[in-house]
């Protein structure tokens, strides 16, 4: 497979870390410039977008929402807030109806505050929380604001105390914390039983591939190219086209581009605070800029092939 800039959407297997996937891709594509768009815990499967080449510079401009399907086991509290952790306590769960359980979920819809798991990558005094936890240090984590755009009750196994959910949330949301807190809200306990990420950063599982798929194509003369072009991953961002060589030269030397402000005012959905992708007439991505509406300029923020 020919290496070029863009994104690979990996369907991660259980037991593999996000960094493991990055290392394998680096080796398979023989390139060092590879990075993932957000960590998936080793036990979590599913969608892991990986940036290749210059696409690594555009990760921050991807959509930040993520969607998961998972199962919560009531009655068990663990050290890691998932089933892999040490059991801390056990408690019975309430015998409530599907409708009643869904009403409890209202507390977890919209903007909420959650405390991350002790075993997480959150920084505490300059160190990852999981490192302190592994040393059995005593520490507290501050609540963090996250947004739950959608929380759907998929199934309620009252006999075994297992809840299946679908959740669409902002980046930085810990589903293990959701599982723990749902258990506490029900005057019980809870931990995450299993989890699959079905979409992340604008990519979904329908476009995902296994790393083994790349391995099979390696060395073939007419191998499949699974890399999604960076410009395709930025389809949610407004576009401005540089129409002549003078404008392109200005852009590539880091100078602002004069624009007709009405070009953007015609778009009702345009937000002046959001980034703009800049391209040429051949649909080649040139970078990212921001509009200065007072001066009617696009100011370069990220420039590809800078001079």
From Swiss-Prot:
Reaction catalysis annotation: uridine(55) in tRNA = pseudouridine(55) in tRNA
Gene, per the UniProt record: truB
Name recorded for this polypeptide: tRNA pseudouridine synthase B
Entry superkingdom: Bacteria
Family of the protein in this entry: Belongs to the pseudouridine synthase TruB family. Type 1 subfamily.
InterPro entries noted in UniProt: PsdUridine_synth_cat_dom_sf, PsdUridine_synth_N, tRNA_psdUridine_synth_TruB
Sorted UniProt keywords: Isomerase, tRNA processing
HAMAP family for the chain: TruB_bact
Record has tRNA processing as a keyword: yes
Keyword Ribonucleoprotein: no
Catalytic residue list: 41 (nucleophile)
NCBIfam families assigned to the protein according to its UniProt record, in alphabetical order: TruB
Annotated GO MF terms: RNA binding; tRNA pseudouridine(55) synthase activity
Cited Pfam families: TruB_N
E.C. no: 5.4.99.25
One GO BP annotation of this record: mRNA pseudouridine synthesis
Task of the protein: Responsible for synthesis of pseudouridine from uracil-55 in the psi GC loop of transfer RNAs.
